[in-house]
Amino acid sequence: MYHHEDDTNSDMNSDDDMSRSGRETPPPRPSHAFGSERDLERRGRSRDVEPRDRWPYTRNPRSRLPQRDLSLPVMSRPHFGLDRDDDRRSMDYESRSQDAESYQNVVELKEDKKPQNPIQDNLENYRKLLSLGVQLAEDDRHSHMTQGHSSRSKRTAYPSTSRGLKPMPEAKKPSHRRGICEDESSHGVIMEKFIKDVARNPKSGRARELNERPPPRFPRPNDNWKDSSSSRRESVIQERGYEGSAFRGGFRFNADLASRSRALERKRRYHFDSDERGSGHEHKSCVRKKPFECGAEMRQAMSMGNLNSPSFSESQSIDFGANPYVCDECGRQFSVISEFVEHQIMHTRENLYEYGESFIHSVAVNEVQKGQGGGKRFECKECGETFSRSAALAEHRQIHAREYLAECRDQEDEETIMPSPTFSELQKMYGKDKFYECKVCKETFLHSSALIEHQKIHGRGNSDDRDNERERERDRLRARAREQRERERERERERELGEPFLTCPNFNEFRKMYRKDKIYECKVCGESFLHLSSLREHQKIHTRGNPFENKSRMCEETFVPSQSLRRRQKTYREKLFDFNNARDALMGNSDSSEHQKNRSRRNFFEGRGFEKPFVESQKSHTITRPPENKDDDKPFTISVNPNDKLKFPIMENGSQGKSYERSVIHSLGSAEAQKSHGGLGFSKPRPVAESSTQSSSSIYYPRAHSGGNTYEGKEYKDSIIHSLPAPRPLKRHRANDHIQCDEGGESSIYIPDIINKGRKIPAREDAYEGSSSSNYHTPNVSRAEPPSLSGESHDSKQDVTFSVPSSSVREHQKARAKKKYIEPRNNETSVIHSLPFGELLAGHRRAKFFECQECGEAFARRSELIEHQKIHDRERPSGSRHYERSVIRSLAPSDPQTSYAQERFIQEQVRKFRAFGQRSTTSNNLSVQKIYAQETFNAEEPHDKETHGQKIHDKEPYGKEPSGKEPHGDEPQDKEPLDQEMRSEEPHDDKPHGQEPHDDKPHGQEPHDDKPHGQEPHGDEPHGQEPHGDEPHDKEPIDQEMRSEEPHSEESHGDEPHGEESHGQEKVEDATIQASVSEEHQKDDAGDAIYECQDCGLGFTDLNDLTSHQDTHSRKALVDSREYAHSEVHAHSVSEFEKKCSGEKLYECPKCGESFIHSSLLFEHQRVHEQDQLYSVKACDDAFIALLPVRPRRNCTVERNPAVSGSAIRCRQCGQGFIHSSALNEHMRQHRDNEIMEQSELSDEIFIQGLALTEYQGSETEEKLFECTICGECFFTAKQLGDHHTKVHKDEPYEYGPSYTHASFLTEPLRKHIPLYECKDCGQSFLDDTVIAERMVFHPEREGGSEIVAATAQEVEANVLIPQEVLRIQGSNAEAAEPEVEAAEPEVEAAEPEVEAAEPNGEAEGPDGEAAEPDGEAEQPNGEAEQPNGDADEPDGAGIEDPEERADEPEEDVEEPEGDADEPDGADIEDPEEEGEDQEIEVEEPYYNCHECAETFASSSAFGEHLKSHASVIIFEPANAPGECSGYIERASTSAGGAEQADDKYFKCDVCGQLFNDRLSLARHQNSHTG
């Protein structure tokens, strides 16, 4: 088979020869026309048809014969054309010409001879071909590798071009590449078959129709054409046409026939090219085509197809319409020789299609299979499945083909279509720079995409997986080492600079942009990620478990903030400012509300008394250490990142240092409102030399003053928390912050308040309290301050008047009147100070880790730490007893502009509280920041005109603004002692403070570290003079105490505002709770105004509704003054944003620890505690669950962050976790019910009915009260037990246990052996152990024992006979209920337990008092008469008296042990055998004792009438005392008048408690229960 390249570049140069012969001596027209047409067709095919190597079938060599003469190459081509591309340019042309010429000479010698046998000719020609065949095949392969690359490159998208590729093995070559006799040993086989075929039929039918064809004339391929005469040439052609027809197959008669043949052949052979584009399809879907296991088979087939045609006669005419090729074995005709060859192969091989190896899509072969198969089935060689049609097999084979292709993709494609050229050859063709080499297997590729595809193979292999895994592990190790080196460098910088160093978030962005390192590493498994989102997804693997079980490990994981937090961070993305000393990018301060939220969380837990110190990284406003040189005013930032070394001073219990007690906290703007200046202009600070800046969002925290406890007997145990969200600062505010640092490296920062600068809260604890160099330069933010509304006069306490704010502020308030909350306030909630943030003025370096103090986890962002700490928040026990009152964190949405409509509410609240003697409410007002409502004993007590720690200093740095006058309003009296106390704890130096009337402090200058406040370094600004208003007296001691805790230093403050105080001990701010919500959060949360009642915490949307509601409180007093004595704390508002993000329950009951998301729910819950008579159960105070099922807000953080997922609600008694509080409610009810049962004496028999029983069914831990006596299975209800008996034990024998009560069960005989009780004295056996106990007392061997035994035997006989009579009345089968008199038999004695237990109170006392024994038996805990089986209330025949038995008893033994004399049931039924002996019965006067009222009746009629009065009680009495048949009926001790007594007695059903007059009615009724 030849390509178009092969034809154009033939070894024989046929085209060139033809063109030259056409110019010099033109060939005959048919030949020339044929050749021209073929040339044109070949050129067109070279452009339009895919390369030859893409053809799925072998080409017929007929298309090459017009170029050839009747020379040796003519015979060689059919044999070798199919196995090479016939690129023979490398052969020597002269040698081939000589071979052709010598062969022509041989032909000329035979010219005059008679044509010999064609077999001999063929044999001779074939031998001559052998001399050239092998060499030509090798040369052809070589020429193909060197020149056929262009077409081969198209056969696969990514050809493999590895070095030194070996030729493809013969077994793996596709069908169209095999069939050429490359092996010399196979030639003989081919020729033998050929000779046999010709010998069998010299004129084979495959060309019998073509004998009359004229011999075709072919041009010579060389110049000998000119030397030969025309007649000679024609005769030779004719002769060779006859003689060589067997080799040529009788084709190529003229141009039209050749064209038609080629068209037919192309139509069949190239149908893949038109559909699947040839080689691409062949490579993908026909990879497994290996139809010939041996190349000799194909060579044999091709030899047959081309050489076996017999010669045809010259006289035969040409029939173009007939099929020229006829199979000798089956007679099938073919028009194309290739189809005929393929068909012949089927006959020459037993098993053509090795379906385990390949499958050939051949229409002709399929046709043959259909014709030959008949009923034959087609079998798949791989799986053995058979098919009746080849099409089904073909479809089935496609499945295996796909599997094979999948396997081939996992390994290098060794079954290439054609032998690939060597690497050196490809380099010669394409150049040495255009190859891609696989580093694993050293294989090269022309395209990078091919290399990528190839490398996937190595990725799927096990060894390659290990290599890749090792490579990835090396990458991780390198990343870890790199991070470790970075951490080491950071530690070195810390040691050099004295402060921790951390890359800021912006620097991480730089690393992402420029380095593309894997900077996100999982702390659990060490895997690194380039993006945070990838790390989040990865961490879900580690956090799917319970976070409380993996607490220690969870804390080591990198915290992943939630998506909502990310979105919020984008709203106030920190700005990049500058680099300093090649350090990290500096960022501006983010919102101070985030700082305050950290602070509030810290105080939330510290106030609750958790022993663990507050996490330093949670501290709200931290600062990087300023330059050590106090004169070096380099810019630095009051950063959000906390300094690990700096700590908050912790204020505990009003600065008393008492742990776990409530703190006294004042809100930020409380005292400032009382001392706010009347008309201050805007401050314009003078710029500092080196632009010391601070973010305007940072705010001065006023010093936390512990308002004296209103209850003087308790020293600050209960915090008096006043809170007001500070109003938004006006837009014009500038900052001057110049902070000096002490030598110890500790810095103190005071965040200025929104309006005033006077009050301060120390934000750091001075680690070096005794240091004399503890100078702090505190930033001061000047802001326009509105006039004070609450502290203008001394009488603000009496008639709290509210000044109207300025017009501009009022207009803004009106605009936002509907967008402000008066947040719900719990009685026990701590203050969260809302600190609105302003504009970012400057950003400076910060170098701090945000580290969680609890688990040691460090974070690069504060927000991540906040989200992380929510995990610890949920793990903390909410009901801990380490603190007296629970501190509930609540965050006020510090919307800067408070609702204008709330002013009326504030006034109303003040009036109400003054009227009721309660503390005045706190309110959110722009001008009124806090009202200190005092208790009745100090409500009228004014303070002197001093304001300590609350003064607003109007002094601006550098004297650019004159000091404003500060009118001091009334402040609570308890603030002064606290102020003094705080000052008293400060180590004082001998530097003079200014001149101040109280505490020796100048007005407008607060002593801070004993610095002369009047002598500031930049003292070009006069100190503001503050007119002092009346201040409560109790404020001064607290103020002094706070000052006393502050370490004083000898250095003067540079630009520090007056009134600033250094950081005291950590106790000072132990429970200082501050929080704020950013403006974005406030905008989101702003909605309709909610007004909350300060008494009960109930919220209202309308102010009028709140006013009306508060009138109800004026008409009632607190239920429990003890309980609310310390509930003077006004809860702060809870921001909806905090609820949504944190998912925490913010309102907690101080008594039981239950948390609620709204104060109204807490109010409803606290009402329950007031009803002690309803909830007096043990442990109610510890683990009470609200009656109203609380539906906690769904934790959004848990949904977004699986690290905090799990059961966050736990039972405080057993520690069991629950997802929802409703489940905990049910669980706690079980605890209460269990405690009730433990306290009850009859807890084992108490059957909780109704709702209580249904609650028991809801839990698996509760006791199952109904037990099956047969199989021991327990059930919650009697109905379930009955259904169990009906379904499971329907056909099983009944074992009458303690719960047997119904007479209907006696209808079925016992089918199970019942254990007997043997008497040790006499050896007799009894069914019931009570009989043995009585027998031990009344043993026959003892005195009087024989009579008792006889009476007992008669009693048993009566008990067995009576049910028979009853069952007869009911219509039951007498045979089934036939009584057995013998007491020793189980069937007879089975009725004994049921009968004997009928007496609840025993028999009536006889003369000898023996009735005490049964009576005592009835009083056993189980309510049974000493019978363990408990069938005491058996209704059937228990009370039927035996007259004969009574007659035999002596008078002193009138009382029978079993007490059958007064049995009510069945008394009217007499034993027939005993009727004749009634006259002998000696009867004693009967009496009846009522169990209810202890009355005694002589007649049964009177007793019956008396019982009717108790009928209602008897009917509804719960059946909680098994063993009592009629419950309240006393039987007579004698048998006199037994028949008459039965009429007046009542029989009670033990199932439902219904009473009946006769036993028959009771038996019928009980049948309804038993079905």
UniProtKB/Swiss-Prot annotation:
A zinc finger (C2H2-type) spans 325-347, 378-400, 436-458, 520-542, 850-872, 1091-1113, 1147-1169, 1209-1231, 1266-1289, 1317-1339, 1488-1510, 1547-1569. Residues 1377-1397, 1405-1418, 1431-1485 have a biased composition (Acidic residues). GO terms for biological process: apoptotic process; negative regulation of transcription by RNA polymerase II; positive regulation of transcription by RNA polymerase II; regulation of gene expression. It comes from the Eukaryota. It is found in: Nucleus; Cytoplasm. Induction: Induced during p53/TP53 mediated apoptosis. Up-regulated by DNA damage in cortical neurons in the presence of p53/TP53. Gene3D superfamilies: Classic Zinc Finger (3.30.160.60). Brain, glial cells, neurons, skeletal muscle, uterus and placenta. In the placenta it is found in all trophoblast cells. Keywords: Apoptosis, Cytoplasm, Metal-binding, Nucleus, Repeat, Zinc, Zinc-finger. GO terms for cellular component: autophagosome; nucleus. Residues 199-265 are annotated as: 3 X 5 AA repeat of P-H-D-D-K. The keyword Nucleus applies. Signal peptide: none annotated. Belongs to the krueppel C2H2-type zinc-finger protein family. This is Paternally-expressed gene 3 protein. It comes from Mus musculus (Mouse). The gene is Peg3.
